[in-house]
């Protein structure tokens, strides 16, 4: 039996595929490569010594999904595929709803037809909107999202809740990520954004390597200890292991399960800059600029439910995140384009 990973050539997807292969799972990957490179899967094979079966295409393509389910004995689906830039989602809401909401719905419908009932969904802390309580627990209010990306994740969560009620065969696990950073310790796979990075650490590391002249810090007037936004940064390998734990715990269970995957600690943008400088002994020039639309001041998790139910905790600290990010960037100054 195999696991279908949509978006498996992407940043979080490729790291999760490594953990699945290391746990001796058979893996099938579907990715349209709009934000990723097929090289990531070649590197996954290098790391693990194992191959995945790869289909290039879109989750909106029902004929392709039917072909994948017909040709492979899929037992579970981990669904990463989707657009994920907060700022871009404000400019292109229709594309975000089409890819993230309609795409998820098409995938679920085809799973149902194929009799595949285990589903792990890559959600996001953005579903909490501007949180009323910090740290954020799974029972905190969702909705009130501040950008179309967050709204698209919230909408899919609502759809999944309704499907879980209506179709008791489904085992649905929703994983709400906080801010994934870092890279595999080998330096072979990591985050490789197209154009100017939307996420903080690739931005910092591209400044460090000389690809960008300086870091733009979006917003310095938030109500935080230094005025810059505070987030819960989690090492991507810890996040990947969380998917494996969720799959092992709930494969074959019925019902809906929701977990925060974070460290439970919040760091500001300037905290992260200082940590990167200290660990890697490099100066990062930065300038303070206006806030980005849709951004909030503070967001970090209470991950204790994942610890209790999945026996999962984030093991890698800030130093490891910085070290692995810089190792990946130095080894791959142009990302996968080298």
From Swiss-Prot:
This is UDP-glucose 4-epimerase. Belongs to the NAD(P)-dependent epimerase/dehydratase family. The keyword Isomerase applies. Its cofactor is NAD(+). One of its GO terms (cellular component) is cytosol. InterPro entries: Epimerase_deHydtase (IPR001509), NAD(P)-bd_dom_sf (IPR036291), UDP_G4E (IPR005886). The active site is at 149 (proton acceptor). It comes from the Bacteria. Keywords: Carbohydrate metabolism, Galactose metabolism, Isomerase, NAD. It comes from Pasteurella multocida (strain Pm70). Its EC number is 5.1.3.2. GO terms for molecular function: UDP-glucose 4-epimerase activity. GO terms for biological process: galactose metabolic process. The gene is galE. Pathway: Carbohydrate metabolism; galactose metabolism. Substrate binds at residues 124, 149, 179, 199-200, 216-218, 231, 292-295. The keyword Lyase does not apply. Involved in the metabolism of galactose. Catalyzes the conversion of UDP-galactose (UDP-Gal) to UDP-glucose (UDP-Glc) through a mechanism involving the transient reduction of NAD. The lineage of its organism: Bacteria, Pseudomonadati, Pseudomonadota, Gammaproteobacteria, Pasteurellales. NAD(+) binds at residues 11-12, 31-36, 58-59, 80-84, 99, 124, 149, 153, 178. Pfam families: Epimerase (PF01370).
